[in-house]
Amino acid sequence: MTYITATYQLGTTDQLPKRAEQIALGLTVGSWTDLNHLEQQQLESFKGQVVHTEEHDGKGYITIRYPEHNVSRDFSAILTTVFGKLSLDGQIKLTDLQLPASFTTDFPGAKFGIEGVRQLIQVHDRPLLMSIFKGVIGRDLTFLREQLEAQLAGGIDLVKDDEILYDNPLTPALDRARIGRDVLNAHYEKTGKRALYAITLSGSVFGLKDQTKRLIEAGATAFLLNTFTYGLDVLRELAADPDISVPIFNHPALSGALIASPEYGIAAPVLLGTLPRLAGADLTLFPSPYGNVALAKDLARGIAVEATRIGETKTILPVPSAGIHPGLVAQLVHDFGTDSVINAGGGVHGHPQGAAAGVLAFRQALDAALAGESLTSAATRQEELRVALDAWGITK
């Protein structure tokens, strides 16, 4: 028999073994001691089992395994079983979730993953660089085209829409796809370098598949999905569709409601690392440890560990985001390694010399960091980096 295994943090150590047994039974067969011997024999294979309990710093930690045949093969069933009504039951946090290998046929994970995305843009030996459209709400397609051209001119690898740039009359998604196709192709013809542009998916959940396919026909090369406002099973269905043949970026919008509390909700590495990887994201965005919405470094690095965990599904690219500027690049490489994405909005568009110079400053900082050269030293001969460091400084 195979199991789904979940670990929880409780706000108390009071009667921990008893509490663990109550949870294991309450989320499976409901009761046990009230059953007669025959009923217990019949239900034994459906019963949750306590694997481990321990106490640490005044908190209780319990691990429970649930028979995999208790659930249907979807995230709704899995999460409702392991943390549905339990999430309402006082100070309790889901800190780890492991699915059995038998689930891989229904949870195949990312189409591309780290190596697939790298292959698309032919960049294999460094972190990827991504920038974000900024200030495009209320602007027209000409403005969007100019921003895309400027970001590409600096040598960016990936560009994504803002997560709040939905399909709209001023910049319709189909037109953005066509512009992206034309600008990316022109960039390739000029430089020989490929890049991807991720368009935000929006609209009715029942129309998303058709929308993505129309966008691909129009030239879309990647998508940004607000996964937690749509649901993990929506991501899974999109990623599993063979006709949706471009990478999908997972955005963490709404996830703060689940990860922010140290006592409640779902641990950030599970919600933004494990689950998007299993659901089929190729990249997963999350708050960096450095910005104004900073996530604790151990949690941010934990997300990256889960995103790049080697197992039955492809590894995916971790994307620490928010508050990123060129002076952070060496720290980012140190904290997240080369299989990661350096993602900036204001750090690109806020460069005093413009967005193209902003991207170039990131490239210069990255080259220096990978060569083991200090950013201060590199800035003495590279103006774009010098101007960026004057504006933002160096974070260590």
From Swiss-Prot:
InterPro entries: Diketo-Methiopentyl-P_enolase (IPR017717), RuBisCO (IPR033966), RuBisCO_lsu_C (IPR000685), RuBisCO_lsu_C_sf (IPR036376), RuBisCO_lsu_fd_N (IPR017443), RuBisCO_lsu_N_sf (IPR036422)
Residue ranges of the TM segments: none
Highest rank taxon of the organism: Bacteria
Secretion signal span: none
Keyword set, alphabetical order: Amino-acid biosynthesis, Isomerase, Magnesium, Metal-binding, Methionine biosynthesis
Catalytic residues, chain numbering: 85
Classification via CDD domains: RLP_DK-MTP-1-P-enolase (cd08209)
UniProt family annotation: Belongs to the RuBisCO large chain family. Type IV subfamily.
Cofactor note as given: Binds 1 Mg(2+) ion per subunit.
Residues recorded as bearing N6-carboxylysine in the entry: 160
Residues annotated for substrate binding in this entry: 134, 160-163, 251, 323, 345-346
GO terms (BP aspect): carbon fixation; L-methionine salvage from methylthioadenosine
Catalytic reaction annotation: 5-methylsulfanyl-2,3-dioxopentyl phosphate = 2-hydroxy-5-methylsulfanyl-3-oxopent-1-enyl phosphate
E.C. designation(s): 5.3.2.5
Quaternary structure and partners: Homodimer.
Pathway the protein contributes to: Amino-acid biosynthesis; L-methionine biosynthesis via salvage pathway; L-methionine from S-methyl-5-thio-alpha-D-ribose 1-phosphate: step 3/6
More details: Has no RuBP-carboxylation activity.
Organism: Exiguobacterium sibiricum (strain DSM 17290 / CCUG 55495 / CIP 109462 / JCM 13490 / 255-15)
GO molecular function, one term: magnesium ion binding
Cofactor(s) named in the record: Mg(2+)
List of residues binding Mg(2+): 160, 162-163
Name of the protein in question: 2,3-diketo-5-methylthiopentyl-1-phosphate enolase
Function comment: Catalyzes the enolization of 2,3-diketo-5-methylthiopentyl-1-phosphate (DK-MTP-1-P) into 2-hydroxy-3-keto-5-methylthiopentenyl-1-phosphate (HK-MTPenyl-1-P).
